[in-house]
Curated annotation (Swiss-Prot):
It comes from Thermoplasma acidophilum (strain ATCC 25905 / DSM 1728 / JCM 9062 / NBRC 15155 / AMRC-C165). This is Threonine--tRNA ligase. The gene is thrS. Its EC number is 6.1.1.3. One of its GO terms (cellular component) is cytoplasm. CDD domains: ThrRS_anticodon, ThrRS_core. It catalyses: tRNA(Thr) + L-threonine + ATP = L-threonyl-tRNA(Thr) + AMP + diphosphate + H(+).
């Protein structure tokens, strides 16, 4: 049924025609409608299954209303604010007295009671004045109405609960069968940061099997949380008193960073990127010229020196690379010019938004900027896409990648940096943005947007993706105002998608900084910039690697590659010999010659996740061998020289899997 088309006659309710309980709405001319709606004319309606993306969104939105209904039943003084659908679930914010995790079960029980009653959910349209009267006791809803409703809007009623909403929703609460409340958090009200709201998170699925699978994955995700693994492996320190949001790496965490840095450096050199360095601080004039001052000022660290000079700690690396590029003139034969840098940037995030390595206030990007001609875009993109695939194959092995192409919204060119041609005098305005643009020659406002640069560049991106056999999704209107981009996501071991790489075209910076080259006819042409970060940032890729591998990183990335354990003090000398030989051959090794038992030594080192535990006793000492134990607990005996060769090969080839 959900994949078919249903003919509905004028005056019929969709709910009366479509009996499939897995259908939660209908789509007519690409617009979603409630099943309780009545057809205003004879229509062909597409049933929307609860198992579809649209259907799941509707289910979760309805579950958010069910949550608000339950909370206001149990806590009559609670004032609901908003309850949107988010990735993997929903939340609802309330102005209410504080509650704890122990209260979730009570709220969930009330939700189940309302669900079992199968209360009809009805859409009603009210004029603005009536809406203000209905929600007069809730200042949060009043603010939403005043800001967003001009004449009229809809509410959804289920029993005694009414909520301001555009919908659509499921026909009745009985459709919301598989749901779970997850946790409670605090949230700052966006219109008054002094006011803290109670945020309750939950999730909902079409059936119990999918819900159980998700909850199991959620538990696995908690076990794999990189913050937990970082503490267990002693990789970094997060000191909220001295450096809130700024990770401090131990020798073990820095080892992982250095390996990632070294690998990216080798890939950059292989692909023609020059390694550069730029300072962490610039005068604010460069940030004003680049546009970061206007756009990112609330998130920048700014300061003024006693002599009056104002400076900003860099939130991005691109202006520094532009400053290097601008030092000389270029011919068309000189391009492309590629600069790369492991550049640390600093962005102020609110304390509630900072978390681990995925949302720090300081992070290091594997940042690169290519300066090239328009006709070179396609080849450069192909090279970068190849680099992306090569890098992630090394880091993750055989992993699923997804590619998103964000392009311009052609119906709203005013939101982007485009060229305009004056219809009155023919003058061409390069790189303008906005609705009120005036021709500098004749002062006419009758301007024709010229999207040819965008179209040319976007087509080269499409061609690059297609020529490499890469499937991608295209998102109109999602491009940055200064150019289209490609985002790359990876799927980890438990099925989560993470965005890592970004390849971003930029028509804005070259205009702002006057970046040109001399073309084959001796004339000046505008340079095109490409911003690229393959890892995204070293912090983010490290976090994802730790969670993907549950801390059991490939040997080349593992801080402790071998851990040598003598079975008694009689073999300490041989154990030291093994340990020193491993180090001499470039293998990161540690040794435990304490008086603890072998089992206790192994138990103590287990959280650090060494690649191999080397146990030595009389047999190994007599034969100059080692017994190596891998992470799965499997043991194998090698001669010392053979084991060194095996591990060195595993490290040098950056293998994902262990030797045995």
């Amino acid at each position: 049924m959900p994949d078919s088309i249903v003919h509905v006659k004028k005056g019929q309710r969709f709910l009366d025609v479509i009996k499939d309980k897995n259908v939660v709405a209908v789509k007519i001319d690409s617009v979603l409608h409630d099943l309780r709606d009545v057809a205003e004319r004879d229509v062909d309606a597409i049933p929307v299954s609860v198992y579809s993306d649209d259907g799941l969104y509707i289910l979760r939105h309805s579950a958010a209303h069910l949550l608000a209904n339950a909370v206001t039943n149990l806590y009559p003084d609670a004032l609901p604010n908003t309850g949107p659908v988010v990735e993997n679930g929903f939340y609802y914010d309330f102005d209410m007295k504080p509650i704890g995790e122990e209260d979730l079960a009570k709220i969930e029980d009330e939700m189940r009671r309302i669900q079992k009653e199968n209360v009809p959910i009805e859409r009603i349209v009210y004029q603005k004045a009536d809406l203000l009267r209905i929600f007069a006791k809730n200042p949060y809803k009043i603010r939403i109405i005043e800001d967003n409703v001009s004449d009229a809007s809809s509410v959804y009623r289920q029993g005694n609960f009414v909520d301001l909403c555009l919908g659509p929703h499921v026909p009745s609460t009985g459709y919301i069968k598989a749901f779970k409340l997850l946790n409670i958090a605090s949230a700052v009200y966006k219109h008054d940061e002094s006011k803290t709201l109670v945020r309750i998170y939950g999730t909902a699925f079409p059936d119990e099997k999918l819900l159980k699978q998700y909850l199991n994955n959620l538990e696995e995700a908690k076990r794999r949380d990189h913050r937990r693994i970082i503490a267990e492996m002693d990789l970094a320190v997060f000191n909220s008193e001295w450096a809130p949001g700024f990770p401090l790496y131990t020798q073990y965490g820095q080892t992982i960073r250095k390996e990632l840095l070294s690998y990216m450096d080798s890939m950059n050199r292989k692909n023609g990127w020059f390694d550069v360095w730029t300072p962490h601080v610039f005068r604010d004039t460069i940030w004003k010229q680049s546009g970061h001052y206007a756009k990112y000022r609330p998130n920048m660290y700014l300061f003024t020196l006693p002599d009056g000079d104002s400076y900003g700690i860099k939130p991005m690396n691109c202006p520094g690379h532009i400053a290097i590029f601008s030092r000389r003139k270029y011919s068309y034969r000189d391009l492309p010019v590629r600069y790369s840098e492991p550049g640390t940037v600093y962005r102020y995030e609110k304390s509630g938004e900072v978390g681990g390595l995925t949302r720090p206030r300081a992070f290091t990007q594997d940042d690169g900027h290519a300066f090239l001609r328009m006709d070179q875009i396609g080849d450069e993109i192909r090279t970068l896409l190849t680099m992306v695939k090569d890098v992630f194959t090394i880091l993750f092995g055989n992993i699923e990648l997804s590619f998103d192409l964000s392009v311009i919204d052609r119906d709203h060119p005013e939101n982007y940096l485009v060229s305009y041609v004056c219809r009155n005098c023919g003058y061409r305005i390069e790189g303008a943005r906005g609705t009120d643009i005036e021709c500098p020659v004749c002062h006419s406002h009758d301007l024709e947007p010229d999207l040819s640069v965008w179209d040319n560049a976007t087509e080269q991106l499409r061609d690059a993706l297609k020529s490499m056999g890469i499937e991608y999704k295209e998102y109109p209107g999602e491009a940055a105002f200064y150019g289209p981009k490609i985002d790359v996501h990876v799927k980890d071991a438990i099925g989560r998608m993470w965005q890592l790489s970004t390849i971003q075209l930029d028509f804005f910076m070259p205009v702002n900084f006057g970046l040109t080259y001399t073309n084959s006819e001796g004339k000046e042409d505008r340079v095109v910039m490409i911003h690229r970060a393959i890892y995204g940032s070293y912090e983010r890729v490290m976090a994802i690697l730790l969670e993907h591998y549950a801390g059991k990183l490939p040997t080349w990335l593992t801080p402790i590659q071998t851990y040598v354990v003598p079975i008694s003090s009689n073999f300490d000398e041989y154990a030291r010999h093994v340990h020193e030989e491993l180090i001499r051959h470039g293998i990161r090794s540690e040794i435990d010659t304490s008086q603890e038992t072998v089992s206790k030594k192994i138990k103590l080192i287990h959280p650090y996740r060494p690649a191999y535990i080397i146990v030595v006793g009389s047999k190994e000492m007599e034969t100059n061998s080692v017994t190596a134990r891998n992470r799965e607990g499997k043991s194998k005996t090698y001669s010392l020289s053979e084991f060194i060769d095996v591990v060195k090969k595993e490290i040098e080839q950056r293998k994902v899997d262990q030797a045995f």
